[in-house]
Amino acid sequence: MNSRKKGMTLVAKQRTAGWLFLAPASIMIAVMSFYPMIRAFIISLQTGAGANMRFADPIFSNYKRILADKVFQQSIVNTFLYLIIQVPIMLILAILLAQLLNNKDLKFRGFFRTCVFLPCATSLVSYSLIFRSMFATDGLINSILIKLGILSTGYNFLGNATSAKIVIILALIWRWTGYNMVFYLAGLQNIEYSVYEAAKIDGANGWKTFWKITVPLLKPTIIMTFIMSINGTLQLFDESVNLTKGGPANSTITMSHYIYNTCFINVPNFGYASAMSFIIFIMVAVLAFINLKVGDTRD
């Protein structure tokens, strides 16, 4: 009887210790994540500014306004265009680079890994300004194209809606490919080499080995990077602000950029900005849920 009581006391102590260790992190998550989300939803139902904030009448008027806001609709189209084009290209490049740089016979692979990873260590503002200067009418890209005889005069890449979007997509791919490559490298190094040897003995070529072994074993990592990339692209801000300032004529503006303008640049409207922010939150949550469901192979 005494031994049972002692055993129960030990279990109770372990549970208490576990909850004590868990409590600080749980409190921080609640304060830094859940409270702001709840507060943002409450503000999204209000109008006014500062101490004059009050609930709107009708209460969902900010959300109703979104349906008629052409600029916000344009920002959604722009953001999803970046998402649909940039994310797949970036992740495919990241997987291929990881596969290439995971080769044990490759010389200076540490140096090449560092070179590919370095772009994501640069400042967001700095790299945006570098791309802006490169694609200016008197920038490096125009100078090269003129010398090659492709152009006769400098082309305003950032002054045209289509080319400006392409510049933003190129900038995103350049910066974030190396970041995702690191995750795939870690995943590749956890795959036993004996698996590849067995496939080679069975007569599988390089493409079959990659498609039938590497990709399925990297599936959890691919899903994780895909969700992170979706989350990051839907909240895209720096490139739109620093590269094109949302122009020309809001043709490259992103959702986060428009929310920032609504909240701080134009006449401040915190309620409407919060409503748009909550729409982004719902988009991220829905897309993440779909990704997890599609990638879940458990019975």
Language-model features, listed with the residues they occupy:
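N-terminal hydrophobic targeting signals that begin at the initiator methionine
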Residues: 1-2
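A structural signal for multi-pass alpha-helical bundles of membrane permease subunits
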Residues: 5, 10-299
